[in-house]
């Protein structure tokens, strides 16, 4: 069982920075026009800018850019000074050095210069103007303005002073005065480009973008070499959404001076935001070529590599940036972020701690550091660090959201829910909190609330990959598999490396039956994240289902190495070992598995052991019920949301049968085809008394084209293919419309089940029967059809259903119809030999021609058998025909693989091993063979002189204690062997190894391959005794072996699955084959193996009881079942509550 779909708790990296501005390295342009362009693609129109500006993280980037520029003006000027040497700089270069915000004109040469008195000293206007510029460049705006005012008072038309006053007032936020000085400058010289550029800054700051653009454009028109104006124009164009023109403006600036590495870096930022990563990369590389010590370009180039998935190159460039500038805070943050994504957690912690050394009260860095602690499993440390981030920045929704994630991981779900709500209180559009709160609601079973929250998260942020994946998981749970696939694909489109989405989509594809596509998804998830334990576990499960045990064990083991505390992987790995009988550390493994299940049930989690596997482990009845109940709840939850607001299904009228209608019974199964369940019950629909019941069969699987399916379709009054109605709600509506009185669940939790249909209650009475050997644990199932031996009242606490007893056994087999050619047999022997009657056998549907041969002799044995439904004990005479002919030619035929031969002149026989090749439908049991089939021990390498003990069950039903009993039996029965099946083949080496370790000669264990149905049953005649598996009996295989007349030894335990064989044997009238203890089990088998007369008598008794008892009597079974179903309806009809129906049947003493 693969783990139920993983719900991504989106642990957002708080305030993750992208491209970084160079502190102090930006050429003159307005501080409020950051060099970062909004995220988007090339050619984004202005109409789409609003959406682009909402890109997660964009606002943080812009604010960081602005804050960096404002806080580092002095450093900016220093960096520019390093780029352009003041001594010998060109006029254009001198212009770039004047101010980070405003453009100033060069002083106009005047002769002679007027003077002003400064600090009692007479100075020229030129000297005072220079002093004003120096103070401005140092950020000393008050002193700069004082000097400018002295000049202005003396010369109101001094153009450089007017421009400088405009710049000073812009920096000090006196925007109106800044605008007035710019207008005065234009009045003085209407061709002054700098004045128009500064006026553009004013309009941009006031939000009048069009006016700003007009002034910037006029500035560059007046002065085409005006770099400052081009940069300001580029920033304004970005704000207006005209990204292509902004790129052009940057290019124009760089054509004037290609060595402006800061401008080139800003152009790279814009190109990156437009999705033009390769062009951005060229810009950053050119900036680094121009100035190799330019740390910002190294950091920005790291951002590009990170966006392209080149994680190691990104790490290298961020590390280079912090090497060049050890105080580069943003580079440390980016380095920490990319190391976190690469899951290099220790180095990520170091990077974040270095950032905190530079800025100890940086809430964002505390938040990111907490995320790493969370990923490392240091939950308490993560919680403390998130709380520190919140203390530093109380209005921090991301931190509240991530704190909630950590609290939830710790098990503090209530507190986690409160933190998500706090995040949403601070920011109602916080999509992460919507998503994560939905996860909690989903785990609480509040599917409707969860769905609403996921949809809300996607409404806020349609590109939210985790929310798409989580919504898909709910859709999968509801059976809307195609819709789920669409959302998983959308999640992967948004986040191509979203490993969880790939893994979950694999689960959905597996459920849809597309195993190859599911494997591809799991492998892709592992390729993305080799440490993704869930994906390894899911891949293991699909290998397990396909019987690829080596691959399954390897993948489960890998999952556990990656995640030692992984209950699903541990329990599934334990089941794999059980399947192949690998019992190393068996007791320890089983104890741990039981503890895992008990812990999960205590915490009200879905257990990691599937209901159908729970019978294999020493779990309490309460635990098995709880496991089943959890799965029943999943079925109920899946359909509950679908039916909200719909009219409840209308049941058949309570008095419809009383008013003359026949009782309508509906059999529901996915196994109407070539499946053991159909092999058992295919004749029942046709043998029901149609004067009493009206039979409906509802198939959950498509037509497999076999005769089994055809027989059921033809002999049922109504056969409905529900596989063509995939919607459980509509399927339930169909059943309700058919007016079914009693609906019978034949699947339980086996493959192909649709218990969701039963959860919708389409019938007033719903019953478990035959196909699933345990309780459903479901409140929507009323009865389980069983018997007093299989389910004595003392074990009623093992079921949520009420017990409804059949009078003999609840089990049935169609062998008398399906395999009637095995009703009789002829033993073939050489004259004068004492070969056993189980060495060489002939079977055919018509024995008369063989029995007429003169070579036929008769062996007669008297025995006592039960007869009929009243189980009357009667004497019976077994007459066994023996054909005495030379057997050597037959043995040669078998050794050479010859298909047919003449035993006598007119008697052609067929090698029984050739049935599959010669008659396919006869081999599968769909048709009765029309030839004489020869079955020999030689065909299976079984010695003629040996006592052959057999077991044809799947090997997972064997446990160490069972094999220990079998070894003891072999040790006490000379010349005995144990005949098992390679079911699966991987179990053979482990069983042989176990036996050898306990001193048993490995040659005494014989394995055969799994065979088609007819051969599988027929070859059972070659065994002397069948040894049943107490842990989980042979159910269908028990019926198979008994049909061949072979005695079966069993021992009932406490589970239903462990008591079926006992019920069969009691119904057959041979309770002496049922042991109460392990010692008795061994004793019964040893006596059969060592006492030839006792064995012969027991074989005769079983052989005769097949046809005299009710065990294989389908007609009688139908009559008994009709009585029982009628009693259920009578109780309902009279308004009586559901209760046990025992019909005073008593459980035999000691059972």
UniProtKB/Swiss-Prot annotation:
Residue positions annotated to bind UDP are 954, 957, 1010-1013, 1016-1019, 1034-1036, 1040
Q: Which residues form a coiled coil?
A: none
Disulfide partners: none
The residues responsible for catalysis, as annotated, are 612
Report any one BP term from Gene Ontology: glycogen metabolic process
Q: Which PROSITE patterns match?
A: TPR, TPR_REGION
The alphabetized UniProt keywords are: Cytoplasm, Glycosyltransferase, Nucleus, Repeat, TPR repeat, Transferase
Q: What is the role of the protein in this entry?
A: Addition of nucleotide-activated sugars directly onto the polypeptide through O-glycosidic linkage with the hydroxyl of serine or threonine. Influences tap habituation in the mechanosensory neurons cell autonomously.
User: Would you tell me the protein name for this molecule?
Assistant: UDP-N-acetylglucosamine--peptide N-acetylglucosaminyltransferase
Which gene is annotated as encoding this protein in its UniProt record? ogt-1
């Amino acid at each position: 069982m693969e783990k139920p779909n993983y719900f991504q708790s989106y642990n957002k990296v708080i305030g993750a920075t992208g491209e970084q501005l160079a502190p102090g390295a930006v050429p003159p342009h307005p501080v409020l026009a950051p060099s970062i362009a909004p995220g988007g693609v090339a050619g984004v129109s202005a109409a789409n800018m609003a959406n682009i500006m909402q890109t997660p993280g964009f606002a943080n980037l812009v604010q960081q850019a602005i804050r960096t520029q404002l806080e580092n003006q002095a450093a900016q000027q220093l960096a520019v000074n390093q780029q352009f040497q003041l001594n010998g700089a060109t006029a254009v270069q001198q212009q770039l050095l004047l101010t980070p915000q405003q453009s100033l004109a060069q002083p106009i040469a005047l002769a002679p210069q007027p003077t002003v008195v400064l600090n009692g000293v007479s100075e020229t206007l030129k000297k005072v103007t220079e002093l004003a510029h120096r103070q401005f460049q140092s950020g000393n705006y008050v002193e700069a303005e004082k000097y400018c005012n002295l000049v202005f008072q003396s010369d109101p038309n001094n153009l450089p002073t007017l421009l400088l006053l405009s710049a000073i007032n812009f920096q000090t936020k006196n925007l109106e005065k800044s605008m007035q000085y710019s207008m005065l400058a234009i009045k003085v010289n209407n061709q002054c480009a700098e004045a128009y550029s500064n006026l553009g800054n004013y309009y941009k700051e006031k939000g009048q973008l069009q006016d700003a653009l007009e002034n910037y454009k006029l500035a560059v028109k007046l002065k085409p070499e005006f770099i400052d104006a081009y940069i300001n124009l580029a920033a304004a164009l970005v704000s207006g959404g005209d990204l292509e023109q902004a790129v052009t403006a940057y290019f124009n600036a760089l054509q004037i001076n290609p060595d402006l590495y800061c401008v080139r870096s800003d152009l790279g930022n814009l190109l990156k935001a437009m999705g033009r990563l390769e062009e951005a990369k060229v810009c950053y590389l050119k900036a680094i070529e121009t100035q190799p010590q330019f740390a910002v370009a190294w950091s920005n180039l790291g951002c590009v590599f990170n966006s392209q998935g080149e994680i190691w190159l990104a790490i290298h460039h961020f590390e280079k940036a912090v090497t060049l500038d050890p105080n580069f805070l943003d580079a440390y943050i980016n380095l920490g972020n990319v190391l976190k994504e690469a899951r290099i957690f220790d180095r990520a912690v170091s990077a974040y701690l270095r950032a905190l050394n530079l800025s100890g009260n940086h809430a964002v860095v505390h938040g990111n550091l907490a995320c790493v602690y969370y990923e490392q499993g240091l939950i308490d440390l993560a919680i403390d660090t998130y709380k520190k981030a919140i203390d530093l920045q109380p209005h921090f929704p991301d931190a509240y959201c991530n704190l909630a994630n950590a609290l939830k991981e710790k098990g503090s779900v209530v507190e986690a829910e409160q933190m998500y709500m706090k995040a949403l209180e601070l920011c109602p559009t916080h999509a992460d909190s919507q998503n994560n709160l939905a996860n909690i609601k989903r785990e609480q079973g509040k599917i409707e609330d969860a769905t609403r929250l996921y949809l809300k998260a996607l409404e806020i942020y349609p590109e939210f990959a985790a929310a798409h994946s989580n919504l898909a998981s709910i859709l999968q749970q509801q059976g809307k598999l195609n819709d789920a696939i669409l959302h998983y694909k959308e999640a992967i489109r948004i986040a191509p490396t979203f490993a969880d989405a790939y893994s979950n989509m694999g689960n959905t594809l597996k459920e849809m039956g597309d195993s190859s596509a599911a494997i591809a998804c799991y492998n892709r998830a592992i390729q993305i994240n080799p440490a993704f334990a869930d994906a390894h576990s899911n891949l293991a499960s699909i290998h397990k289902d396909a019987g690829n045990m080596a691959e399954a064990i390897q993948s489960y083991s890998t999952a556990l190495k990656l995640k030692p505390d992984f209950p699903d992987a541990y329990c599934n790995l334990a089941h794999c070992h059980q399947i192949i009988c690998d019992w190393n550390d068996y007791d320890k493994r089983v104890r741990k598995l039981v503890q895992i299940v008990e812990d999960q049930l205590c915490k009200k989690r879905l257990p990691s052991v599937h209901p159908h596997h729970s019978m294999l482990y020493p779990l309490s009845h309460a635990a098995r019920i709880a496991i089943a109940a959890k799965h029943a709840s999943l079925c109920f939850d899946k359909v509950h949301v679908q039916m909200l607001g719909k009219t409840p299904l209308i049941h058949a009228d309570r008095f419809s049968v009383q008013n003359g209608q026949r009782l309508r019974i509906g059999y529901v199964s996915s196994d109407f085809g070539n499946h053991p369940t159909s092999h058992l019950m295919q004749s029942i629909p046709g043998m029901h008394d149609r004067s009493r019941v009206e039979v409906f069969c509802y198939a959950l699987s498509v037509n497999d084209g076999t005769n089994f399916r055809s027989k059921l379709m033809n002999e049922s009054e109504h056969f409905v293919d529900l596989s063509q109605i995939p919607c459980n709600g509509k399927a339930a509506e169909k059943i309700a419309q058919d007016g079914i009185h009693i609906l019978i669940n034949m699947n339980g939790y086996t493959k192909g089940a649709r218990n969701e249909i039963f959860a919708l209650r389409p019938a007033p009475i719903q019953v478990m029967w035959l196909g699933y050997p345990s309780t459903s644990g479901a409140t929507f199932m009323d009865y389980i059809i069983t018997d007093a031996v299989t389910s004595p009242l003392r074990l009623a606490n093992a079921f949520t259903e009420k017990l409804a007893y059949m009078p003999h056994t609840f089990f049935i087999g169609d062998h008398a119809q399906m395999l009637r050619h095995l009703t009789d047999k002829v033993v073939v022997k050489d004259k004068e030999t004492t070969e056993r009657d189980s060495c060489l056998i002939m079977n055919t549907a018509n024995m008369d021609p063989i029995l007429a041969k003169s070579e036929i002799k008769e062996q007669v044995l008297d025995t006592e058998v039960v007869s009929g439904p009243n189980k009357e004990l009667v004497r019976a005479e077994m007459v066994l025909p023996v054909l005495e002919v030379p057997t050597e030619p037959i043995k040669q035929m078998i050794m050479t693989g010859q298909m047919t031969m003449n035993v006598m002149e007119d008697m052609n026989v067929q090698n029984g091993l050739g049935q599959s090749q010669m008659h396919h439908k006869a081999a599968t049991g769909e048709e009765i063979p029309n030839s004489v089939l020869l079955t020999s021990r030689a065909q299976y390498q079984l010695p003629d002189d040996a006592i052959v003990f057999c077991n044809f069950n799947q090997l997972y039903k064997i446990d160490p204690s069972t094999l220990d009993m079998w070894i003891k039996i072999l040790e006490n029965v000379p010349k005995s062997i144990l005949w098992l099946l390679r079911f699966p083949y991987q179990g053979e080496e482990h069983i042989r190894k176990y036996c050898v370790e306990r001193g048993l000669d490995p040659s005494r264990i014989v394995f055969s391959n799994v065979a088609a149905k007819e051969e599988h049953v027929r070859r059972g005649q070659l065994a002397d005794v069948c040894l049943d598996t107490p842990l989980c009996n042979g159910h269908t295989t028990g019926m198979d072996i008994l049909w061949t007349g072979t005695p079966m030894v069993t021992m009932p335990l406490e589970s239903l699955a462990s008591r079926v064989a006992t019920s069969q044997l009691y119904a057959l009238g041979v309770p002496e084959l049922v042991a109460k203890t392990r010692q008795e089990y061994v004793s019964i088998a040893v006596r059969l193996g060592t006492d030839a007369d006792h064995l012969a008598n027991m074989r005769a008794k079983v052989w005769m009881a097949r046809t005299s008892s009710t065990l294989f009597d389908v007609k009688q079974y139908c009559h008994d079942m009709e009585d029982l179903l009628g009693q259920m309806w009578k109780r309902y009809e009279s308004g009586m509550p559901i209760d046990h129906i025992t019909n005073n049947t008593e459980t035999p003493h000691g059972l």
